[in-house]
Amino acid sequence: MGLVIAVSGLPAAGKGEFATILESNGIPVRSMGDMVRAEVRARGIPEAPQVFGEIATQLRAEHGDDVLAHRLTKAVDDLLVDNPIVLIEGLRGTAERVVFQNHWEGDFLVVAITAPKELRFERVQSRARSEDGDLSDLEKRDAREAGWGLNVIISEADITFGNESNIQDLESRVTAWLNTL
C-alpha cells in the first residue's frame, strides 16, 4: 500500500496551494471540501458563505463526525492501486483523522499549513470562493472548525509548513520535503 497524506489548516492558510504543488508533482488529490460543495449542489441549495458550514455540520450531525472520511477512503484506496502517494485536502476533524489512521495505519501522515489570520483574510478577499465572506465569516469558520478538532489536528501534525511568504517559498520547501519521502 502507498502513502496517504492529509493536509489540514485553517481557512485560506494554503491547503489548496499545498495540493496544487503535490498535484504538479504527479500526486492525485481528493478534497473533503469538494465533497461538501457537491452535497450543497445535490441538495439544490444556493451557495453562500454560511451554507457550506451548515451542510458540513448537518452531515456530521446526521451521520457522525467521521462521515466525510468514511465516504472518501474507498476513492483514495482506488487511487493507491496506481499511485504511491495520494493527498487528501482539507482534513478538519479528529474523528476523520481516527478513521484515516485506523484505515491506513503507518502509511498515513498529517501535514498542517499555518498562516496568520490577517494574511488568511487577505487571501479570502482575493480568491472569491462562494463559501468565503467577510472577516466575521472567517472567524465563524475558524470557530466552527475548531469545534470539530481542527486546532488539535494542526498542533499534532506530523509536519507543519508556515505559509506567511509567497507561493514560490512554499513550493520550494514542500518540494524539498517531497523529495525525502
Q: Where on the chain are the PLM-derived regions?
A:
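Walker A/P-loop
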Residues: 16
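ATP-binding Walker
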Residues: 13
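Conserved phosphate-donor/acceptor-positioning beta-strand/loop module used by diverse small-molecule
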Residues: 89-90, 103-131
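Short, well-ordered beta-strand core segments
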Residues: 29, 110, 159-162
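P-loop (Walker A) phosphate-binding loop of NTP-binding proteins
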Residues: 10, 22
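ATP-dependent small-molecule kinase phosphotransfer cores
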Residues: 28-87, 91-99
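Small-molecule kinase domains that catalyze NTP-dependent phosphoryl transfer to phosphate-bearing small molecules
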Residues: 66, 125-180
